[in-house]
């Protein structure tokens, strides 16, 4: 299965081959290791997934670091791909998210890789026979022209400084990601999602991202229930402010399944207290059914471990400081999932683990304690630690950036505890990659 070739704009084939080889050695062994760890994929499934990664994803991660205009800002390590493990009591699976950079990455002609995103999404949609009704609407609503993208990049430092504590200077990124996609690996197939950053349009126009998103939601077909959108708009406006929406995500499905597809809004908070979690998960008390209460009870019992505080925390108002307060750091994230015809969104909690961890080794211990508390076998016999080491090397290894990125939690009666652990593969020098090839 090979997607339609994207125009390479005269790029040297030998250069492209080296770029793809670099990304292959950056993540393919790690992905294969995680696939094996889940015990959910047969030999044919694993081969199919590695082929999809090699043929559809690696060519679209941009140039290798030495040839790129700058790093990806998807992950802390600068990697354009984030691997993850999804776990429930009955099944584990692998997922990955990647910034859409095409062959050229962010370039002078396409500074935020907007046109690249349109081309790659169209190609993937054709390959997997997916509807483009929502994806085209999402991309067109938040896209900017190359000239506008250059304006956004010039405006970025001042815009970011407005979110940093007074008197502090932060290390400004050269750009912000515009579009990402993710693949849930289901057997030999993938379920695709598309994510677009509404902040690009916000920076350019001065219109808060939330206002832009509500307009997008209300014009989708099949339509979302007005009651559900109104409820979410009131809550986010009252609790998060007009610029809280970080990402808009959609399920990419065929036309027959569009009526059950999700739109996901991601918002951040500047507090990590469990009181904040309770407020967001219940939409200020609007959602208070038995399932929500049960999920909150489980989450509360492991909250200190997710915050990397194994000795416990003082109370539900405990607000853990981030590791580096000079950075633009959001303390928690929440996603609100809407489907056509539903009255309430489903809320998932995300912890940016990298903001709180001391070392990957300590985080492994905390995650294993979480698995034990949730009756998941990865908490026994140092199983999770072995999974991590097999994929990424010893946790004791000195790294500039941690490999653990984020963690998410959701509880439903159907799946039980649903957790996702996210990983940022370290960016290696090209001489290191060549050494690994020789070895």
UniProtKB/Swiss-Prot annotation:
Description of what induces expression: Expression is down-regulated when the stress-activated mitogen-activated protein kinase (sakA) is deleted.
Binding-site residues for substrate, renumbered to this chain: 95, 193, 262, 264, 266, 350
InterPro entries: Aro_prenylTrfase, Aro_prenylTrfase_DMATS
GO biological process: alkaloid metabolic process
Knocked-out gene: effects: Leads to the accumulation of paspaline and 13-desoxypaxilline, but also lolitriol and a small amount of lolitrem J.
GO terms assigned for molecular function: transferase activity, transferring alkyl or aryl (other than methyl) groups
Key words of the record: Transferase
Entry EC no(s): 2.5.1.-
CDD domains according to UniProt: PT-DMATS_CymD
Pathway as given in its UniProt record: Secondary metabolite biosynthesis
Matches recorded under Pfam families: Trp_DMAT (PF11991)
Protein's job: Indole diterpene prenyltransferase; part of the gene cluster that mediates the biosynthesis of lolitrems, indole-diterpene mycotoxins that are potent tremorgens in mammals, and are synthesized by clavicipitaceous fungal endophytes in association with their grass hosts. The geranylgeranyl diphosphate (GGPP) synthase ltmG is proposed to catalyze the first step in lolitrem biosynthesis. LtmG catalyzes a series of iterative condensations of isopentenyl diphosphate (IPP) with dimethylallyl diphosphate (DMAPP), geranyl diphosphate (GPP), and farnesyl diphosphate (FPP), to form GGPP.
Similarity annotation: Belongs to the tryptophan dimethylallyltransferase family.
Protein name stated in the entry: Indole diterpene prenyltransferase ltmF
Biological source species: Epichloe festucae var. lolii (Neotyphodium lolii)
UniProt gene name: ltmF
